[in-house]
Every structure is written in structure tokens, then in C-alpha cells.
């Protein structure tokens, strides 16, 4: 199915609800998303995000998902920073996209590169994919991401390295997670996600409120040398 995330039936109830409640719009949204994904350089990142946010808003409304945003005013005025959210589920990136007006790209593990729907979303936001079993390739991606930040764009990286299977509990951060920020000498923005595991990673269609908290940024001067 075009909304199959490879996680079994537990994801499908809410996804089907999102589709059914937007049945008339789904063909148009899917074609639009695929066209943007196939022509990533034809549109600006802002245009990609405008399209993506429309889809996310419609999906949220149809799927009983409310996204509450806190602290968006804490984001640095100038682009060129790295956001470090906790990693709860497949919905994380969509929640952040819906919670703030800024554009960003994502550093993700290569295992999610070809998941339908997410594949198209990742193409639109110019995501970078890391092979965690290949140190040389991983360092290359880190350098590429740092260059993206130096160009004045924003990057998301999940420092836990994988999704927590324990709800809102944090996992230990991976060593090397902050190399992108160190190389780019840019502000770090901690992002706290709450209940992001519920929409796509739990077997329920009950209304859920997802929280995205943008915490105070940490300037390079405060973490250099750590």
C-alpha cells in the first residue's frame, strides 16, 4: 500500500482513518507529493514545505491528531542551526514540520530511505541518509550536513540514533551526534517531542495531542570543546 510503513498492522488503523476522511483529496495530494519528490530542484524548499504542511494538516485533522507547538519563538532568527529532537516514531518529522514555520532537512538512517510516503517526503526536503555500518560514508554525510548548515539551512538529527520503544522515555545519545553542529559552528536547538509515537506506532485511533517543544538554543561558544 502507498501508506505502508513496514511496521505491521499496528500503524494502519489511524493511517486508514486519515485516508478515508480525506478520500477526495488523497489522489491529488499523492500525485502532488510524488511530482514534488520527482522534481526536487524545480521548487524552493519553502514551496516544498508549503505543500507538505498542507498534507500534514489534512492528515492530522482526519486522523484525530492535534499538534501543539511550544517555544517556536526560541528558534534563532537566522537560519543555519541544527535541531536535536528525541526520536519517538515515524511521525516525528511530520510533527516538527507542522509545529514551526521554518524549513529544514533531515539526517536519517538509510533503512528508512525507501519507505513509501516517507520516501517522497524525504526527497522534497533533501534528506541525507547515513549508513551506520559504514564509518567512511557516515563521516561523509556528517560533512555534507555541516556544509548545508554553513549555507544557512537548518538540519535535524536524532541524537538517540533510533526510535525509543519506551514511549516518552529517552534513550542514550550516540557518540558523534553533535559533530555536525561542531563542524558548522552553529547554534544547537534542543527539541522535546511528547506522544509522537502514538499516531503511527501504536494500535489506536483515539484523539491524541502531540507536543513539540523548542527549547532555548545553545550557541557554539557554550558547547565548543565539550
Model regions: which residues?
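Aromatic (phenylalanine/tyrosine) cluster motif
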Residues: 2-5
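A transmembrane-helix-recognition feature enriched in membrane-embedded lipid enzymes
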Residues: 8-68, 120-121
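Catalytic core of membrane glycerolipid acyltransferases/transacylases, capturing the structured
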Residues: 33-37, 47-49, 62-63, 77-135
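Residue-level preference for the first positions of well-ordered beta-strands
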Residues: 80-82, 154-158
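A cross-family acyltransferase "interaction/gating" segment
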Residues: 117-120, 153-156, 165-226
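Anionic-ligand binding region
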Residues: 137-146
Amino acid at each position: 500500500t502507498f501508506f505502508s510503513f513496514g511496521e505491521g498492522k499496528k500503524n494502519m488503523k489511524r493511517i486508514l482513518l486519515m485516508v478515508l476522511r480525506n478520500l477526495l483529496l488523497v489522489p491529488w495530494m499523492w500525485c502532488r507529493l510524488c511530482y514534488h519528490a520527482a522534481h526536487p530542484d524545480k521548487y524552493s524548499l519553502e514551496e516544498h514545505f508549503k505543500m507538505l504542511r498542507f498534507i500534514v494538516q489534512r492528515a492530522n485533522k482526519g486522523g484525530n491528531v492535534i499538534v501543539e507547538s511550544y517555544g517556536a519563538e526560541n528558534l534563532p532568527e537566522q537560519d543555519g542551526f541544527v535541531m536535536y529532537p528525541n526520536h519517538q516514531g515515524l511521525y516525528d518529522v511530520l510533527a516538527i514540520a507542522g509545529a514551526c514555520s521554518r524549513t529544514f532537512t533531515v539526517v536519517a538512517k538509510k533503512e528508512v530511505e525507501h519507505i513509501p510516503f516517507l520516501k517522497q517526503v524525504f526527497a522534497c526536503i533533501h534528506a541525507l541518509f547515513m549508513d551506520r555500518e559504514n564509518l567512511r560514508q557516515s563521516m561523509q554525510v556528517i560533512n555534507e550536513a555541516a556544509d548545508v548548515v554553513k549555507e544557512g539551512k537548518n538540519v535535524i538529527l536524532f541524537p538517540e540514533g533510533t526510535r525509543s520503544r519506551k514511549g516518552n522515555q529517552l534513550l542514550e545519545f550516540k557518540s558523534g551526534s553533535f559533530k555536525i553542529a561542531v563542524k558548522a559552528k552553529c547554534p544547537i536547538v534542543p527539541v522535546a517531542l511528547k506522544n509522537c509515537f502514538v499516531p503511527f506506532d501504536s494500535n489506536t485511533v483515539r484523539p491524541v495531542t502531540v507536543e513539540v517543544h523548542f527549547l532555548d538554543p545553545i550557541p557554539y561558544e557554550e558547547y565548543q570543546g565539550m
